[in-house]
Amino acid sequence: MNKKQLAIVLWFWLVTAVACGGTAENNTAVAPTAEGAGEVASGVYADGAFKIVATTTQAYDVAQILTEGVPNIEITPLMGAGVDPHLYQPTESDIAAMNEADMVIYSGLFLEGQFDTIFAALREQGVLIHAMSDPVKQGGFTIGGFELSDELVDVDDPHFWFDPRNWELTITDLGEALAEIDPENSQTYAENATAYAAMMTPLYEWANEGLRKVPEGQRHLVTSHDAFQYFGAAFGWQMEAIQGLSTEDEAGVGDIQGTVDFIIAN
């Protein structure tokens, strides 16, 4: 493995640390019904803000971008950069924020593995719970067949955002959801979503052109955690990881030796 390949390995390790680990505030209000569908209130909620909670930095970023220019929205992030969502345990303040929220935006596909029971309870309270991965799953673009535990088998890889085309689906879907919840500001949501989504195809094409310049037999990516299957499928790279799909998986001696053997062989 030459220095250039090593640099690629280190760069992706850093990206994994941040991504598996956000900024436009203020928006208009919607009153959620018992089923979780929103009806626009008289401009704003009684307390003057439509409160959104975003679990991950990705959720926080897209929420801020899509709500830019809409008054009276408060967006609260739960996890900072570098926080691992696989292992993150909601704190008392997190639970309080979600209980007070009108909408919670999360990644889904078991990325936030410790949140499922909380989300179920929030839905019963009428809080809008939006999974960013839903349009990717519904479109048939997830990579599946993984086993997380004895109970969770044949599950999908939750790291869907490493293919920009999947993120475009997320942007469009969330923009439509916000517009439906808050029709008074639907044009702003639509314009923000259209502008942001339009960046994804050029990003994919730029990355695809550059990454495929590496000879096919040398497109190997070694990471500590198996988070790049979507990247590999999108850009024609072979993945090798010490840990499995979730960082809850413990790497054994055999896993480490297998990775060492892979590096030596390639």
Walk through the language-model features, giving the residues of each.
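Bacterial N-terminal signal peptides that target proteins for export
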Residues: 1-9
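Extracytoplasmic metal-acquisition and chelation regions
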Residues: 20-266
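Bacterial N-terminal signal peptides
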Residues: 9-17
